[in-house]
């Protein structure tokens, strides 16, 4: 979805600063039709909407919208803000480097998966076959906050590897998995949405998530992640969770 929002007409002069994804229906393993449109035009601020449809095009009555995303695009600045960037890095140093100083891209314990017929991480899927995940703190199915470096092993759209904003958005979906508060055999955690806000362009092939998950008696949770690349902080991600006990 980030690739569609970023690449829509006029995107070369704009930065995709926020991506919000609404997961409307289960996404089938079948061809999908994409639609992208400009919701709010502007020279400095734009809103772009992208949607994915199953069983036909958006104009087909039989088609079903399965995913919708809104992208906030801001005009790329032409002024030299080097001094401001350096000042911000200095005053925020203690906070910004909390996770990044603990490890470097490509280091940490490799997350491996054993396949079975169960639920969650025991199944084959994107988490096990499309990404490389390395933990400097925590692990999948280890309860509590976690810090993880991840990279994509395969292209998402076309043949080119995902980089920049699309890479950060794709890996931000792992916030809850990095910081789960219980095991997936007992509870299901459904990501109802995902919002990723970035203050600069990510660089390199690795993205770091420093994540924590909070839950309530309402059966609602929130997975929050501080995002980093090899040069430091790039933004934050948040996913709203629906919690349900699994059938015994």
Regions from the PLM with identified roles:
Residues 1-248:
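Terminal targeting signals and extreme-terminal segments of soluble enzymes
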């Amino acid at each position: 979805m980030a690739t569609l929002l970023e690449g829509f007409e006029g995107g070369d002069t704009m930065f995709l600063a926020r991506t919000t994804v609404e997961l409307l229906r289960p996404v089938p393993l079948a061809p999908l039709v994409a639609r992208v449109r400009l919701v709010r035009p502007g020279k400095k601020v734009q809103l772009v909407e992208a949607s994915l449809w199953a069983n036909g095009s958006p104009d087909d009555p039989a088609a079903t919208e399965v995913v919708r995303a809104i992208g906030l695009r801001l005009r790329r600045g032409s002024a030299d803000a080097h001094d401001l960037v350096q000042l911000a890095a200095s005053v925020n140093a203690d906070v910004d480097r909390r996770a990044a100083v603990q490890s470097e891209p490509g280091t940490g314990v490799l997350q491996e998966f054993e396949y079975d017929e169960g639920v969650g991480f025991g199944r084959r899927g994107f988490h096990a076959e499309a990404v490389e995940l390395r933990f400097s703190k925590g692990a999948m199915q280890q309860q509590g906050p976690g810090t993880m470096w991840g990279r994509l092993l395969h292209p998402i759209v076309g043949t080119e590897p995902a980089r920049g904003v699309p890479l950060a958005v794709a890996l931000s979906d792992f916030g809850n998995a990095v910081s789960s508060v219980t095991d997936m055999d007992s509870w299901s955690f459904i990501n109802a949405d995902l919002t990723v806000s970035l203050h600069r362009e990510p660089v390199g092939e690795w993205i770091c998530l420093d994540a924590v998950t909070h839950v309530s008696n309402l059966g609602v949770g929130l997975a929050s992640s501080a995002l980093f690349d090899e040069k430091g902080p790039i933004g934050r991600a948040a996913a709203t969770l629906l919690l349900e006990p699994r059938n015994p």
